Amino acid sequence: MLTDHTIKFNKLLTPFSFLYGIGVRFRNQLFDWKVLRTERYDLPIICVGNLTVGGTGKTPHTEYIIRLIKDRYRVAVLSRGYKRKTSGFLLADQRSTSKDIGDEPYQMKRKFPDILVAVDADRRRGIRNLLALPENKRPDVIVLDDAFQHRYVAPTLNILLTDCHRLYTQDRLLPAGRLREPMDGARRADVIIVTKCESCIQPIDFRIIEEDIHLSAYQELYFSRILYGELEPVFSGKAPRRTLKGLASTTEVLLVSGIASPAPLEKEIHKYTEHVTSLIFPDHHAFDRHDIQKIQTAFKRLTSTSKLIIITEKDAARLRDLPSLPMEWFSHLYCLPITVGFCMDREKQFQELIVKHIDTRIKNHPILR
């Protein structure tokens, strides 16, 4: 069963969660009462977000949608650009770094160089700037990354993600739990995806969770799981091709991660070698020379003649920008890409939902083309 585990809360912080909840509920009511104005747009706007802080898989799901539609439409991704060193609206180009636009937008621009990637904390301003582009560059569809709480923009399709190991229905408001807003905010979602499922999901899990989240008639429920790709050299051409399946049982791996939920990645690598040393940093950690020294010290402690460093794609974005990395890393440093797949043979149904939504919106507003 998917949710057979215990979620820990800080009970001492419960009074603060109560006060936080009052503020968030009042803000949501202001939007519901139309005191705060929500902007609507003619073109398709797909929001991918969640109710919680921490990793639910927004980036791989956003990339899944990009991969699905990029050859059919002109696609733009608009993100806040979390922890970037710039401000205001910025349209990414091939010279942009993770410091300029943030880890996730940088990763998406590297993977999909032909799409538009923009960052702006003010999503309305960001959309206005994208729609002000020349007609041959103007997007047909905008994907909003992590904007479920940004209610100043009304998406035409709202996709809500929830980790199967920590459903929002079982969580509590910040700071005692991880909820950004009360769970009834899920009513704004058109699609709910239960993420990070095990490959052995059973139909009974679908029914239990469907009842647990009280799915509304207008909502669709999907389950997805993480799919790991092949190891990729962080510095192209500097390291030999390697695969997880090809690792010898004696291979030693130093796993370096600065993401919200590193446990699934650790579990995956342990399938191929027992010799895994983990260095865990906070989510979106800005690596500095002291961290590099710490990683180098840990790497030198590995005694096998077959050893490598594995990092996530997001961490690779930050490490690439650092000067003076140890030379020996260039032939030992790999990142492990991830994608998502849908469970219970519903992948085609999800794809059709996305494409039909976009086609319908564009057909109803042909001027967009």
Curated annotation (Swiss-Prot):
It catalyses: a lipid A disaccharide + ATP = a lipid IVA + ADP + H(+). Belongs to the LpxK family. It comes from Parabacteroides distasonis (strain ATCC 8503 / DSM 20701 / CIP 104284 / JCM 5825 / NCTC 11152). GO terms for cellular component: plasma membrane. This is Tetraacyldisaccharide 4'-kinase. The keyword rRNA-binding does not apply. Pathway: Glycolipid biosynthesis; lipid IV(A) biosynthesis; lipid IV(A) from (3R)-3-hydroxytetradecanoyl-[acyl-carrier-protein] and UDP-N-acetyl-alpha-D-glucosamine: step 6/6. ATP binds at residues 52-59. It comes from the Bacteria. SUPFAM superfamilies: P-loop containing nucleoside triphosphate hydrolases. Keywords: ATP-binding, Kinase, Lipid A biosynthesis, Lipid biosynthesis, Lipid metabolism, Nucleotide-binding, Transferase. Its EC number is 2.7.1.130. Transfers the gamma-phosphate of ATP to the 4'-position of a tetraacyldisaccharide 1-phosphate intermediate (termed DS-1-P) to form tetraacyldisaccharide 1,4'-bis-phosphate (lipid IVA). The lineage of its organism: Bacteria, Pseudomonadati, Bacteroidota, Bacteroidia, Bacteroidales.
